[in-house]
Amino acid sequence: GSGGATNGFDATGTNNPSLFTFNNPSGVWEVVSNTNSNTLTAGTAYRLMVRGDRTINLSSNTPTPTTTILRATGSLKTGNFTPTLNQTADGYSFVGNPYQAPIDIKAVLSASSNMNPDVTYYWDPTLNTRGGFVTRDLSLNSNSVASNFNQYLQPGQAVFVKKANTNLTASMTITE
């Protein structure tokens, strides 16, 4: 990321950003510029570009991925979580699982107001050679492509959800 090690990222030749959040109200990706002063928050969905272990040649645009382990520390989230949502009709919001236990996103969407309860969009890193999106039809319990993703959002996992095609206010509460 920008500033390399000074801002809490591994230094690279370009120091291009590798950690992003999705601004749900505006529908745009935003760079996380510093992990030393910006604490990652449970429930906030992040897009992280993982290159693999530190032996990867960063001068190549297509290095072979390597296995790596990411570790998180901090306090466990307890209590209800209410994400800020995109209020545009058919607007997308990126929502993360705030807990260290799976959540049933189908049940969450069914209990939400003015959200599309039938569809979610997951990133599956095992598709193709670099990953790809999977559309999960919750009403049919099926995926758009062969993928192991289901309605249970795992700890540390995020998903795009869609607002219903309405001008009414959408709301969602994820309960523990």
Where do the language-model regions lie?
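N-terminal exported-region signature
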Residues: G1-E176
